[in-house]
């Protein structure tokens, strides 16, 4: 059966597939070497996590020179990032044990429970205000959590379940598009109240992608997409500081913009320019010396470009390209096996990781206006690392179940 399906899957049978559980007679499946998960996907993910950890350390090593961070050691962010990665890997190990059927059954409840977090951040003494935005819930012990990162994952699994349930009426405006638009409006209102337009942009993109991949009516999908894009344009037009960002992006080198709205962009471009092909060397960045704000989060790629050059940036871009392509391959395999929910989830994860990486890379290279989105799996930030790794774990689970089914087993 596996050999007959290989032409449709567009990939060669790999060694890991050969080591999957094999059914002997009527006995239960046995494992030959326990290579049950996509080893390449695991290693590429670990590579990005390790790469990000090293660059976060490099970007923050001089922070303690500033009076604002004088009470912290040079290893403060490195230790916190290492702890976040360890917690994310532990959570991923738990998530990868959950069957996709169970995840689908609980997807709606997970989604609506996650919306409670978006409400909590708006409440006094619960939500933490940073630079005029309330995006974090504060827990005892100084731990912060960003609910919008959780909503990215729960919205994805909910949208996939929604499209599976609506397959018979997926062409209907009243039964498919309007309910999804209503849900998106609720999420949008809560996120824009923080405000967090970047997270809303990612969630809207994920939802639209799943509607499209799920076979929604083409004309209605186009109208829905135009409405969403129009809403974002309207928000920019009605917001003076968002308009300033657009104008600054168009002309970042004017004196007023370079010292104002385009300050981060201009310094990110300077960092990229200094790096040239091979960079100035690990640890040799000048822009991280309190010139480039958020060098360890939104603009980590600029520091990579400065210290490791175009080659270092190219490694990051290729790794994300590989993950996105692998996610779509896994989704296509699931679809061939008549597992539509798993297919939509896998490809939705590809859209999420790839889309957010594309926006972050575009901002760092000056190809897109400045937007507060981190680089998945690499930038400093415990909530984002946790949910990115959990998303990869779900992707591994989909692939694992695909392999079991292709070998004649049951999940």
From Swiss-Prot:
Keywords, in A-Z order: Cell cycle, Cell division, Cell inner membrane, Cell membrane, Cell shape, Cell wall biogenesis/degradation, Glycosyltransferase, Membrane, Peptidoglycan synthesis, Transferase, Transmembrane, Transmembrane helix
Database matches in InterPro entries: Cell_cycle_FtsW-rel_CS, FtsW, FtsW/RodA
Transmembrane intervals: 41-61, 82-102, 110-130, 137-157, 173-193, 197-217, 220-240, 299-319, 348-368, 375-395
Pfam hit, one: FTSW_RODA_SPOVE
GO cellular component assignments: cell division site; plasma membrane
Catalytic activity: [GlcNAc-(1->4)-Mur2Ac(oyl-L-Ala-gamma-D-Glu-L-Lys-D-Ala-D-Ala)](n)-di-trans,octa-cis-undecaprenyl diphosphate + beta-D-GlcNAc-(1->4)-Mur2Ac(oyl-L-Ala-gamma-D-Glu-L-Lys-D-Ala-D-Ala)-di-trans,octa-cis-undecaprenyl diphosphate = [GlcNAc-(1->4)-Mur2Ac(oyl-L-Ala-gamma-D-Glu-L-Lys-D-Ala-D-Ala)](n+1)-di-trans,octa-cis-undecaprenyl diphosphate + di-trans,octa-cis-undecaprenyl diphosphate + H(+)
Signal peptide region: none
Main EC class the enzyme belongs to: transferase
Membrane topology, Periplasmic segments: 62-81, 131-136, 194-196, 241-298, 369-374
EC number of the protein: 2.4.99.28
Membrane topology of the entry: Multi-pass membrane protein
Gene Ontology MF: a single term: peptidoglycan glycosyltransferase activity
GO annotation (BP), single: regulation of cell shape
Side Cytoplasmic, residues: 1-40, 103-109, 158-172, 218-219, 320-347, 396-411
Domain of life of the native organism: Bacteria
Pathway assigned in UniProt: Cell wall biogenesis; peptidoglycan biosynthesis
Annotated localization: Cell inner membrane
Family the UniProt entry places it in: Belongs to the SEDS family. FtsW subfamily.
Database matches in HAMAP family: PGT_FtsW_proteobact (MF_00913)
Known function: Peptidoglycan polymerase that is essential for cell division.
Protein name: Probable peptidoglycan glycosyltransferase FtsW
UniProt organism field: Thiomonas intermedia (strain K12) (Thiobacillus intermedius)
């Amino acid at each position: 059966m596996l050999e007959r399906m290989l032409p449709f899957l567009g990939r060669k049978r790999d060694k890991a597939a050969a080591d999957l559980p094999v059914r002997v007679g009527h006995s239960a499946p046995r494992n030959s070497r326990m290579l049950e998960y996509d080893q390449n996907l695991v290693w590429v993910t670990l590579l990005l996590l390790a790469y990000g950890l090293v660059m976060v350390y490099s970007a923050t090593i001089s922070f303690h020179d500033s009076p604002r961070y004088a009470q912290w050691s040079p290893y403060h962010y490195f230790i916190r990032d290492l702890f976040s990665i360890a917690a994310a890997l532990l959570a991923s190990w738990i998530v990868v044990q959950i069957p996709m059927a169970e995840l689908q059954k609980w997807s709606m409840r997970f989604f609506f429970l996650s919306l409670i977090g978006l409400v909590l951040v708006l409440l006094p003494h619960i939500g933490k205000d940073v630079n005029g935005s309330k995006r974090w819930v504060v827990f005892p012990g100084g731990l912060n959590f960003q609910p919008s990162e959780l909503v990215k994952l729960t919205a994805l699994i909910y949208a996939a379940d929604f499209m599976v349930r609506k397959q018979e009426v997926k062409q209907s405006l009243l039964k498919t598009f309007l309910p999804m638009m209503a849900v998106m409006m609720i999420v949008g209102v809560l996120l824009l109240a923080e405000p967090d337009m970047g997270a809303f942009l990612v969630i809207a993109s994920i939802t639209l992608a799943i509607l499209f991949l799920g076979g929604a009516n083409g004309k209605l999908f186009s109208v829905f997409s135009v409405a969403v894009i129009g809403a974002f344009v309207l928000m920019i037009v009605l917001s003076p500081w968002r308009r300033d960002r657009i104008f600054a992006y168009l002309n970042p080198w004017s004196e007023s913009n370079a010292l104002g709205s385009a300050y981060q962009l201009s310094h990110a471009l300077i960092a990229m320019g200094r790096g040239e092909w091979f960079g100035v060397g690990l640890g040799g960045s000048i822009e991280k010396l309190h010139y480039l704000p958020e060098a360890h989060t939104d603009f980590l790629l600029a520091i990579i470009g400065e210290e490791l050059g175009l080659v270092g940036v190219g490694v990051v871009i290729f790794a994300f390209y590989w993950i996105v392509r692998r996610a779509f391959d896994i989704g296509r395999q699931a679809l061939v096996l008549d597992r539509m929910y798993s297919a939509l989830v896998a490809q939705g994860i590809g859209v999420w990781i790839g889309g957010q990486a594309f926006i972050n890379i575009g901002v760092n290279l000056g190809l897109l206006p400045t937007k507060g989105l981190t680089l998945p799996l690499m930038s400093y930030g415990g909530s984002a690392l946790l949910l990115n790794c959990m998303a990869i774990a779900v992707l591994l689970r989909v692939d694992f179940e695909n392999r079991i089914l292709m070998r004649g087993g049951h999940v």
